[in-house]
Every structure is written in structure tokens, then in C-alpha cells.
Amino acid sequence: MAIHIVEEANRCLGCKRAFCQIKGCPVQTPIPQVIDLFKQRRLEEAGELLFQNNPMSAVCSMVCNHSGQCEGSCVQGRKGTPVHFSSIENYISTAYLDRKEWTPAPSCGKQVAVVGSGPAGITVAIKMAQLGCAVTVFEQRPEIGGVLEYGIPEFRLPRSLVQKYRHVMCSLGVRVRPSTTIGGALHIDDLLRDGYDAVFVGTGTWRARKLGIPGESRGNVLFGIDYLVDPTSVAIGQNVAVIGAGNVAMDVARTALRSGARKVTVYARSRHISAIDDEVELTELDGAEIVCGKAICAIDDNGPVFETAIFDEDNNVVGYEGELDHVAADTIVIAASQVPKDKLVLTTGGLETDHRGLLSVDEHGMTTVPGVFAAGDVVNGPLTVVHAVAGAKLAVEGMTSYLGL
């Protein structure tokens, strides 16, 4: 492992105009600088640089779309193989989390509430704590992590890594209130009443988007985002049909295969697969089949019913064949995107959303309620961890300015 990483680091050209950083990375990770520090055996400094730019660096090293971002932008890849920065980043970042001694920053006298402890919430909690704010995180589930803990499968992201962030936050003085839903017994108005100077909302998108087709409420149907929370609680059966073509659909398919399913088929309406290329390849490698051109129109006791798409020369859907395709399946898992839950919006006066239920924010990450900021999936819809971090960093800048820090 270490030899491979050193070899990869030595392949880096140290480009002055580093496309891996400026073009490939949503959070502008200073990749050439990190690799240079690593090559000089200045591991702690490299880890510090990564962490301060992106507290979720260790997570991103495992779940990012590297081939479509940093590694996909590496100039070495034009005529050969790109530098595998993901391996280098993982080595540095996990070592940094294990070895770093964390201490609380001097108090600045401000209190911040963070609602949700997914990647955006953790990023904001850490950043604001480092500025000396007294931070309290409110998490509706027993464990922190959000999608990191309850969405991304263990085989992609070890839970032990996710829980290291609880240690980091607590060591920085962050208080965590698990199993507490804001929008339930407590509302955002209560937080503002109780002296929090700013509130950050990073509650993600945890409500499955229903398809509105007959049979969606049958007992042989699951929603992907709910299934991934606890796959062991469901008898998935031998033959599984997954509806959708995004990352959640791929995670569902791979999880089902690890849960005893013998045949897993992913059905996509179009020929455009929105999931990360690497995840699609791994899904097929694990044994799932991906079938394009199937638009689900109903579900019966035997399985899904599809219309078969007709494509033009540009692979656009231009119509459907007349005959319906009835497919046998023990379980149908719908993984066709998700939207935010509406409890928080319904209990917060003046908090505006768009037509999808996503929170509206300005260029500083502030919502339509003064002092309440938001970022991540609850603003953008379901994207990747690194995009959540990018939004969280913008919100931190906005909160810092708002608080006069």
C-alpha cells in the first residue's frame, strides 16, 4: 500500500496550473501542494492542509467521483494513467484523523446550532467550533453522519471512519444531541429564542420521491433510501428489481447482492445513467444487470410492469412500444431520487422553498429567515459528499460574516 502511494506521488508533475485542483475538484483541494508535502515526508502538514480545506477529506477519498473529477482532470491521464490522488488522500487523511490531538478554540462568545449531522453539518460544526463558537449539533437519528452513516453502504464507507468525526467534534467542544428532531418537539424558533446566534440546516433529502404509479404501496415494494438505512431488517428475496439509475440505485443493487439476492436487475428509463461511472462498473462487476429503456408504469404482486422506450439516433426517448413488459421479481426497490422532509419547513415561519421542497438560500448561504443558513442536499437535491462540503464552506463564510467574526 505505502509503496504504491509513494510511486503515485512521484508521478505527479506538480503542474503550476493544476487542472486536478482548479477544474476537477469542487472544493479546490490543493493537490500539488499536498503531494509535495507528502513527498517531503511532512505528513502532518499535508493532513492539516487537506483537513482545513475539507474536513471530510478522509471520506471524500473513499466515495468521491475521482475519475470524473480530480483524477479525470490529471494531465497524466491524457496519454496514460492519471495519478491516483484518491489513494494518496486516503493515506494522509486517515492518518491525520488518527494522530491529531484536538483541543477547543478560545471562545468567541457566539452560539451556533447545527441541524443535521451529515457531511454539510459536520463540516459547519467543525469550522464554527474552530472559530471559537459554542456549537450544538441536533441529529434526529441515534448516530451522527447522516447519509454517511445511514445511506452509503458499509462496504463503500466504513462506519468506524464516520464515527471518528464524533470524536473530532467532541474534542473541539461541540455538543451533540442525538435522536432529536428539529421540527418535532423543538422548532427553529426555539433555537433562536434560546440564544443561538445562528442556525445551520443540513438535514439532507430523506423522503423518497414516489413515482405515482399503481402498486407503489404493495408489500413487495421498498424505497431505496429507506432500504439502505438498515438492509438487514428486510427479507429481500432471490430476485430483485431496482428502479432508477443514480448512485442510490447502484448502492441498493450492490447491497441486495450482499444480502442474499441471486439476481438483481437495475432498470433505467433512458440510456443516460446518472450514477458515477466507477459505481456503475462495480455494480456490474458485483453481478447486477443494468437494463436501459424501461419506464415503469405499474407494480403488481408478481413484479414491475414496464413500457419499453423507443430511442432516436441521439439516444433520446421518442416514444414507447405498444406492448407492456411484465417482469417477475420478489422485491421492487424504487430508487428514483429523493426530496427533503417537510417538518422543518412547516414549523418555521418565513422559510421558503422551491417547487421541489429544497430550501432557498442567497449567495451567502442564508435562507429567507435571518440568521438561518443551509447547504448540502437540502438546498441542491441529492448530490455527492464533496458538493455538500462546498456548500457548507460557503455557508460558513456567510455565518462568519453575519456573526461579525
Stretch-by-stretch model annotation:
Residues 111-136, 250-257:
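N-terminal Rossmann-like FAD-binding beta1-loop-alpha1 element of flavoenzymes
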Residues 89-106, 164-184, 207-259, 353-368:
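Glycine-rich dinucleotide-binding loop and its adjacent helix/turn
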Residues 217-238, 314, 319-382:
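FAD-site-proximal beta/loop scaffold in flavoenzymes
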Residues 173-193, 231, 293-296, 302-330:
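A structured beta-alpha segment of the ubiquitous adenosine-cofactor-binding alpha/beta core
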Residues 134-137, 141-172, 176, 253-297:
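Rossmann-like dinucleotide-binding cores of NAD(P)H-dependent redox enzymes
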Residues 106, 111-115, 163-213, 297-302, ...:
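Feature captures the FAD/FMN-dependent oxidoreductase FAD-binding
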Residues 1-106, 111, 159, 201-217, ...:
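Ferredoxin-type iron-sulfur electron-transfer modules and their immediate structural context
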Residues 116-119, 245-246, 377:
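Glycine-rich Rossmann-fold phosphate-binding loop(s) that bind the pyrophosphate
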